[in-house]
Amino acid sequence: KKLPGQVEECINGYPDPTFGLTKRPGFQHIGNLGTGTTYDNSKWFFISRTDDEKYIGCITPASGGSTGAIAVWNAVTFAACNITYGTGAQAYLTGTRTDYDVLTIQDKSILTNKLITAAKTADPTFNANRQGTIKISGTSVETTYNGTIEGNTFSVTTDNNDTYSDALGKIKTAIDNLNISNLTVTKLKDNLHLSRTNAAIGGLTITGGPFANQANAFQDQVATLDELPSESMNNHVVKVVNSGALTSSYFLKYVANNGTSGPGYYEETLSPSTSTGLDASTMPHELVNTSVNNFTLQRISWVARAVGDDDTNAHPSFIGNKITQSFFHNNRLGFLSADTVSMSQSGDFFNMYHTSAQTITDSDPIDLSASTVKPVALHSVIPSTQGLVLFSANQQFLMGAADGILTPAKTVIRTIANYEMDTIIDPVDTGTTINFISKTPSYTRVFAMVTRGENENPQVADIGRVVNEWIPSTVDTLISSAQNQFIAFSGQTTRYIYFFRQYAEGKDIKLQTWFNWLAPGNVQTIAADS
């Protein structure tokens, strides 16, 4: 687009559609953080809380077997901030500059270490069939109940005037008389509860009545709710198999009103043999701004999985994989890992599990894969009005729903483009376009993308073509300012900051320009506070 006589290169200028080409604003020296190499290979981030409270921070690289550390300065007063580490938190800082992702939400910054594999807590030890229930559903004149337990048989016949309670009492006495070691039998309203402390209860059966249908026994599971007694022992957990399909079963726990046994109610619960959820030491950590100039790095208190098992309420897909980026969208906290996108419950950012194993609600977590015929490793995400634009090394995707509201049932991921891009430098949003880069061995190409919905390919332009080979491949930072309509690049091995600025009125682009600034020394990081 250059015309004869136009400027070939602009250093330390600032093109403006109103004032023309002016000098850039002057730099202000605020303070000295160290030598020119003190913070080399550190991950820098900028936090803007209010106009009067802003911070510049960095994560120093781990080296020589030692973990990294966090340093934060007040960007207004330049006071060094106090950093406190929660239990085991600093052990999470094992990476260097390119191994971290930082997402700030209000007073918290979510730090993700891309080197660490997310893990679940260990499955608890579960001893099957150490509890059992004998339930009678009918009694009549001289009803006979025949049962077996631990290879022993017993038989009880009721008298003319025996009640349910009397029949249960006789069955309890018959079992007690077998003298089975460490077996406790408790009589309740309509059943007997059996528990054994040192071994499984083997071969528990019972029949009753002329048609052998007036009594039944179960241990860790029942086929339907009808088999459950009206009372049980507190915290007694039973699996309801339902249709028999793995995804149709669920678990119920009995809650006694007095905390021991007797009257109470059943509530949905977690399988006793299943992990309670996420291992916080392997998950992203939070840097909390506790007060002015005070920060605490700590493990996040993730909400435990409360219901179901690995089939009906599975762990998020990132378990067993490395999380590459965190993001916030539609009132949900999300994570990228391999080819999957995992998002929290709506409004409950640290809850990655379903509320119930029996049904899916719109607020439940979302977990989808962007798999195609090509290998996919998602590394970046940009929220847009059409949904989430997902980026991998060679493909771009759009994750969204027809009505714009992301739910487990309605959300889909579709491929929208197939551009090669850099996986280290994240794309940025300028308000009207998304900019991303692609590197060659000697220079950097810059692209601008405008999404047009899930059913249309985006418009993509190579905006760096007019300055081909001008931006070196050594840049490591890309930022944007929607307010000032520019993007900027910097690298820790160069003094130059490279800018692209455009001005548009509607769809009519009035100004497009490339220029650079020369800093006094190599640029560690840049940020736009607008």
Question: Which residues are covered by each model-predicted region?
Answer:
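Repetitive beta-strand solenoid architecture
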Residues: D40, I105-Q106, K322, H329, ...
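Short, exposed beta-strand/loop patches in secreted or surface proteins that constitute
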Residues: F45-S48, Y100-T104, T125, N182-K187, ...
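N-terminal beta-propeller domains
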Residues: K1-F78, T224-A377, S438-N457
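Extended, beta-strand-rich, solvent-exposed assembly scaffolds of outer structural proteins
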Residues: D40-F45, D52-K54, C58-D107, N113, ...
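Beta-sheet-dominated scaffold domains
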Residues: T340, G347, S369-S530
